[in-house]
Amino acid sequence: MSRLNRTVSVAPMMDCTDKHERYFLRLISKNVLLYTEMIVSEAIDRGDKKKLLEFDMREKPVALQLGGSSPKLLGNAAYLGEEFGYDEINLNLGCPSKKVQKNRFGACLIQEPNLVADCLSEMISKTTLPVTVKTRIGYDNVDQYENLYNFVNILKETGVK
């Protein structure tokens, strides 16, 4: 697979980056990397995979953004993302929503770098696609430069892009 052009990427946002917005953005630019809304790995595991993961190939290049904290479920979701034709798999570590945090995914995982590393390692082992993260630079009391530096280095060791 050729390297994705990341000059411009449209950040994924719940209730915004749906298939209609991606179609519209693709009309404006053929090259920008688009993202799905965050899809929770548990929903993929238990739900209608086709309904959750299918997209129009005219949207490409498009990254599948996942949320979750189970290495096994995230690995399986990454595998399915490749099967459905996505160009990249992205783990959401940036969503600050209270509902998302209550379910132990999104930005709150910044407090658990070893769990995140386990999740990323499993995802990377299940796909040949690039695996990336969307993150914040801090979270609550984990907001010092040293925390960010250590967090990024732990993730980097997994091979995440």
Regions picked out by a protein language model, each given a short descriptive name:
Residues 1-8:
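Extreme N-terminal starter segment of soluble prokaryotic enzymes
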Residues 11-13, 37, 65-67, 92-94, ...:
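A cross-family glycoside hydrolase active-site/sugar-binding cleft signature
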Residues 13, 70, 96, 108, ...:
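Gly/Ser/Thr-rich beta-alpha loop segments that engage phosphate groups in nucleotides
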Residues 13-87:
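Glycine-rich, positively charged N-terminal anion/phosphate-binding segment
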Residues 23, 27-29, 75-89, 93-105, ...:
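Alpha/beta enzyme core
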Residues 51-55, 107-109, 149-151:
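Short, hinge-like loop/turn segments at secondary-structure boundaries
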Residues 67, 105-110:
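Core AdoMet radical
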